[in-house]
Swiss-Prot record:
Involved in the dimethyl sulfide degradation pathway. Activates the expression of sfnG and sfnF. GO terms for molecular function: ATP binding; ATP hydrolysis activity; DNA binding. ATP binds at residues 49-56, 112-121. Pfam families: Sigma54_activat (PF00158). Gene3D superfamilies: 1.10.8.60, Homeodomain-like, P-loop containing nucleotide triphosphate hydrolases. This is Sigma54-dependent transcriptional regulator SfnR. SMART domains: AAA (SM00382). Keywords: Activator, ATP-binding, DNA-binding, Nucleotide-binding, Transcription, Transcription regulation. GO terms for biological process: regulation of DNA-templated transcription. It comes from Pseudomonas fluorescens (strain Pf0-1).
Length: 367
């Protein structure tokens, strides 16, 4: 386990990402409204989402809306410590409990007493520690390693994972009884690609925050750069966006972030179990991304090129049948035939003059 908020200065005690409560997408607004309802309770919360979607941010928001807001918020990464140290870090240890234990130390549960303990990557906990965690949640007391004395605690537990715990239960890697104990309230965070309305508000937040840290003046972002950010799929979610903006601010000039300043990854992450992946791979989304690449190339006569490509593709899809092609595109056969001749897909019939359709357009595309 690792305490996620390590800087000694209170001003730096949380990451910029962990304070970015600037959501405008309808999905995020609905989630925030739900948080308003569940935060005042003492119920355990299980937060599910891909890496970098803002699970710690949601946990902090719940804490700040609760009656524990003036008490400690402790964030712990359950996968950051070896199995031999997990118990001592979570529950504490007495002097001499193991080699190197030169003094007694309180665990994270004791440190969070009266407040909130956020257990990130809960699915990484070893099974033996899951048993002890379940007992702590049930009895509301901890026993330090090397001690027999129970220490009462008053802690609200929020947990998060980026894996499907139901599958982990079936595979024997996670306890079912612990799952139900943690999953009183279930919050599922959508990936950033499924809430595009958050991209630019988060971008502006990161620009402002990092500009202050770097000692910069006012930094703006060009429309072209905004368009590039909106068109990217963000496999690393909010964490990736934060890193991109941080890097961009280091290399941009004249206080304006331009399209070419943005360095976006070419990495494609396949998520066969992701229910949201199909929406991003819809024909409309694929077509829009293709248009964006054409726009970035700044090629001339785009309208005509798109028309020609559409007609050629439809003609081949219809097995070179003019009538079917015209029907598929919603055009007259004469217009279809004339354009097929123009793009070289159909030979001119010299015995029959081609209709003069000089002023007629194939299709009106708004791109």
């Amino acid at each position: 386990m690792q305490l996620l908020t390590l800087p000694p200065s209170p001003a730096l005690a949380t990451s910029i990402r962990a304070t970015a409560q600037v959501f405008e997408d309808p999905k995020s607004q609905a989630l925030l409204a739900h948080l308003q309802q569940v935060a005042p309770s003492e119920a355990s919360v299980l937060i599910i989402g891909e890496t970098g979607t803002g699970k710690e941010l949601v946990a902090r928001h719940i804490h700040n809306l609760s009656n524990r807001r003036n008490r400690p918020f402790i964030a712990v990464n359950c996968g950051a410590f070896s199995e031999s140290l997990v118990e001592a870090e979570l529950f504490g240890h007495e002097k001499g409990a193991f080699t190197g234990a030169l003094s007694a130390k309180a665990g994270w549960f004791e440190e969070a007493d009266g407040g909130t303990l956020f257990l990130d990557e809960i699915g990484d906990l070893p099974m033996a520690i899951q048993v002890k965690l379940l007992r702590v949640l049930q009895e509301r007391e901890v026993v330090r390693l090397g001690s027999r004395k129970s220490i009462p605690i008053d802690v609200r537990v929020l947990a998060a994972t980026n894996v499907q715990l139901e599958k982990a239960i079936n595979a024997g890697h996670f306890r079912e009884d612990l799952y139900y104990r943690l999953n009183v309230v279930n919050l599922e965070l959508s990936p950033l690609r499924d809430r595009p309305g958050d991209i630019l508000p988060l971008t502006r937040h990161f620009i402002e925050a990092y500009s202050q840290r770097l000692g910069y003046g006012r930094v703006t972002i060009s429309p072209g750069a905004e368009h590039k950010l909106r068109g990217y799929s963000w496999p690393g979610n909010i964490r990736e966006l934060e890193n991109v903006i941080h890097h961009t601010l280091l290399i941009c000039r004249n206080g304006v972030i331009e399209r070419d300043d943005l360095r976006l990854s070419n990495l494609r992450i396949d998520r066969p179990d992701d229910q949201h992946a199909t929406a991003d791979d819809s024909p409309e989304a694929l077509l829009e991304r293709a248009f964006q690449k054409l726009f970035e190339q700044q090629a001339g006569a785009l309208h005509e090129k798109v028309e020609d490509a559409l007609l050629r593709s439809a003609y081949r899809f219809c097995h070179y049948n003019q009538v079917h092609t015209a029907s598929l595109l919603g055009l007259s056969r004469n217009v279809t035939r004339t354009r097929l001749i123009k793009i070289g897909e159909l030979a001119v019939n010299k015995r029959r003059p081609t209709e003069n359709l000089q002023g007629e357009r194939l299709i009106q595309l708004s791109i």
